[in-house]
Amino acid sequence: MLNTALQVLSKDGSIADNTYQVIGEDGVLPQGDVVLTVEQLDQLAQVSGKKALLVTVDASPETHEFPLDQLDAIFIDFAGFNDGRGYSFAALLRRQGFQGELRATGDVFKDVLNYMKRSGFDTFVIKEGKDILEAAAGLNDFRNPYQAST
């Protein structure tokens, strides 16, 4: 489950509070900024604030057609650091023309941030129990990549 209480680290190193909410178990759509699951996309038009979509490994942009022009952000969930599909999803969404915020969630920590940033991510929700300040300090550990990026 997405933890909306955690702070958000931007690729420029700034830290901010998360403004997005999820639909609760009661099914009531909250006011303000909302992140929807793929199954909840039918409620997109009713969101009063910013609109975000949570993409898991089961909802590939290759096999699903998302309303990219109606979304302010897409959250890509990393179930485990050794699962590279989230990187591919980010690059694919950028190639498909998504201009909004790409946010990495789930198993996100300092050692993977540069790879995520190079794949097109703008913001990161650092895994609970990991130090967000340490992660921010490591954002520029690698300044000269040897491979092309997105």
Features from the language model and the residues they span:
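N-terminal, charge-rich interaction modules
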Residues: 1-41
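Phosphate/adenylate-binding glycine loop and adjacent helical scaffold
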Residues: 3-17, 46, 57-59, 69, ...
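Structural preference for beta-strand elements that scaffold enzyme active sites
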Residues: 33-35, 50-54, 73-75, 101-103, ...
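Glycine/Thr-rich beta-alpha phosphate-binding loop at enzyme active sites
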Residues: 52-92
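Catalytic cores of alpha/beta
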Residues: 55, 62-66, 110-123
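Glycine-rich beta-to-alpha transition loops that act as phosphate-gripper elements at the mouths
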Residues: 57-58, 103-109
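Glycine-rich phosphate-binding active-site loops on the catalytic face of alpha/beta enzymes
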Residues: 121-139
